[in-house]
Amino acid sequence: VSFLKDKTERNRLHGAFPHWLNGETGKTIAFSPKDNGADIVETSFLIEGLLIARAYFMGNGAEEQLRRDITGIWNDVDWNWFTKGENDGLYWHWSPDYGFDMNMKIQGFNECMVTYVLAVSSPTHPITRRAYNYWTSGEGYTDRVYNGYPIQASMFYTGPLFFVHYSFIGLDPKQMSDDYVTRGYWVRNVTQTLINRAYCLETAPKENRYSQVYWGLTASDIQGGYTASAPDNDHATVAPTAALSSMPYTPQYSMQVLWNIYNNYRNKMWGLYGPYDAFSLRYDWFANSYLAIDQLPI
């Protein structure tokens, strides 16, 4: 927190952080040619973690100062700036060199739910209710049925499982519902997990070798690269983070995957930090890598 407060203050843009920054100097590292400024989604993940820490460290002295520093960082973020003055949804990026040229509006149910929740609840620079409601626009807001499971506010075939992980590290879906997810976000997130599992067991090509102990599609390393695996983007690769980070939603089914990896693939899939990022039985491929954003939800 001291690093974020002291090293990044002059490099923050409207209080927001870049996608990447130098871990020693705090200066921005460009993620792409025009993505060399503020990233409000990555900022929201950081703020989510900081607010969790602020709620946990409730002591006096150093912990009291920690809470003040976190509050200062949280209050500095000008969420409303990222509506581009349109009062009609958030934009993902802003650059001091290119402005809003990337023009990527944030919409649909995905990992950005926490971005909208933090933006509308900011004590200093909140967006309006109208701007918040923009997330429901586009294909990401549709009631659908897959593999016998009805789901609210879903994109085509629900998307990767990290949609129900990243935002809900800090948000409690059991206490969330709105006009668009009337049955509540807990039911919605459980259902997305069950659909992901049901796709693997019932719908996916048999050659992919999915089973009750080998399922779970989400963003991960794959053989030869990286992708956001999902029922409509199936690369025959299971990422342990998919099922294991879904433990609150499907504890019994998720434990089956964990025990399978540990008991049957430990020599290939288990290292210092637990299970490696992904593996494919179809292609006899096993990652030897870790991705922090996959390990954290576990």
What kind of region is each of these model predictions?
Residues 1-297:
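Ser/Thr/Asn(+Pro)-rich, low-complexity disordered segments
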